[in-house]
Amino acid sequence: VRYKADIQRYTLKSIEQIVSEATQARANGAVGFCLVTAGLGLTDKKTKFIAEAAKAVKAANLGLRLIACNGTATVEQLKELKAAGVDNYNHNLETSRDFYPTICTTHSWDERYQTCLNVKEAGLKLVCGGIFGMGETQEDRISMLEAINSLDPMNVPLNFFHPNKALPIVKNTITREEAFDLITLARKMIPNAHKIMIAG
């Protein structure tokens, strides 16, 4: 099942534009730069493009850490990105294994977990988190945090669901107090990773 959200759609940016935006990001104080594509995962075409973009940004000597976020990926594809200069790969588990079929039917939770394992095998640093407030239970939240910790990620994005009228989840099911409690819980359950709080 796919939903049509009111978002801007565009094709891949040019390598020149990507380098220009990375340069501006560094000038604004950024220490990392993310190369993101939409879709299920990496294809040969996308892998080649992200690799070319990574090489170009690294060649600009900006001192930026490069993070790729391109969906499911094989070890071979990830090794190609690493060789091109990508430092981290971001692939979130989103929620618990049990609750996952409620929010996504295009691919399985196990595929997401396997991609995270592939990231580690390829020698990239893993960025892996999830989203809170989609109707999951506290048990689901704990299960997801346990799964994330088992992957020993470098960074953990903690997303809090932002409703979109195109989606069947009509409101955030988490209170501000619960959100703060979950941040505390994540710090305890995933002690060795850097936690990042963002919208989702």
Language-model features: locations:
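Core AdoMet radical
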Residues: 2-21, 25-119, 125-132, 154-159
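Hydrophobic alpha-helical scaffolding
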Residues: 8-11, 172, 176
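Conserved C-terminal portion of the radical SAM core fold
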Residues: 35-37, 110-168, 178-199
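Short, well-ordered secondary-structure micro-motifs
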Residues: 46, 79, 102, 138-140, ...
